[in-house]
Swiss-Prot record:
Keywords attached to this entry: Cytoplasm, DNA-binding, Nucleus, Transcription, Transcription regulation
Function: Part of a specialized transcription system that mediates the transcription of most ribosomal proteins through the 5'-TCT-3' motif which is a core promoter element at these genes. Seems to also mediate the transcription of NF1. Does not bind the TATA box.
Originating organism: Mus musculus
Gene (name only): Tbpl1
GO terms (BP aspect): acrosome assembly; DNA-templated transcription initiation; dTTP biosynthetic process; spermatid nucleus differentiation; spermatogenesis
Protein name (Swiss-Prot/TrEMBL): TATA box-binding protein-like 1
Lineage, broadest ranks: Eukaryota, Metazoa, Chordata, Craniata, Vertebrata
Phenotype of the disrupted gene, per the record: Significantly reduced NF1 levels.
Length: 186
């Protein structure tokens, strides 16, 4: 087994966060009274609205800015955001779906081996930081991709990046480094 051999790694996307604007003022009280699956947080000035399909939660501000979380793909996030805009239109608001952007993608990937974290950190010092007293994972940052990886000794890697492509590229880039520090099977 070598680092160059093609190993199929399953990257499971667990959360996609997106943001969009409605280009109109939203009356939060009206949304809270007439909308479905709504929680009104008056003290912080926002409304939480949940959709069942796709399963997303939206945070709505009166300025018209909406943040959607919980989607499992970029396409699902856009579909859910459009459904949310449509439901606001049905409540009587002059919603125009604009400035849609995926801002964060969270994914999990399992390596087919365990990793020696102290050795990995020593070999990749400027990018990797490991504080076992504070957190059981190595924090590895790839500035060019704006991605952060949490690498656990079990071989599980949690990747946070700006889009799905950056997450996949980050896993491809980190594989040879974690392969060097894998635990030998007895």
């Amino acid at each position: 087994m070598d680092a160059d051999s093609d190993v199929a790694l399953d990257i499971l996307i667990t959360n996609v966060v997106c943001v969009f604007r409605t280009r109109c003022h939203l009356n939060l009280r009206k949304i809270a009274l007439e909308g479905a699956n709504v929680i009104y947080k008056r003290d912080v000035g926002k409304v939480l609205m949940k959709l069942r399909k796709p399963r997303i939660t939206a945070t709505i501000w009166s300025s018209g800015k909406i943040i959607c979380t919980g989607a499992t793909s970029e396409e699902e996030a856009k579909f859910g955001a459009r459904r949310l805009a449509r439901s606001l239109q049905k409540l009587g608001f002059q919603v125009i779906f604009t400035d849609f952007k995926v801002v964060n993608v969270l994914a999990v990937c399992n390596m087919p081996f365990e990793i020696r974290l102290p050795e990995f950190t020593k070999n990749n010092r400027p990018h990797a930081s490991y504080e076992p007293e504070l957190h059981p994972a190595v924090c590895y940052r790839i500035k060019s991709l704006r991605a952060t990886l949490q690498i656990f000794s079990t071989g599980s890697i949690t990747v946070t990046g700006p889009n799905v492509k950056a997450v996949a590229t980050a896993v491809e880039q980190i594989y040879p480094f974690v392969f060097e520090s894998r635990k030998e099977i007895l």
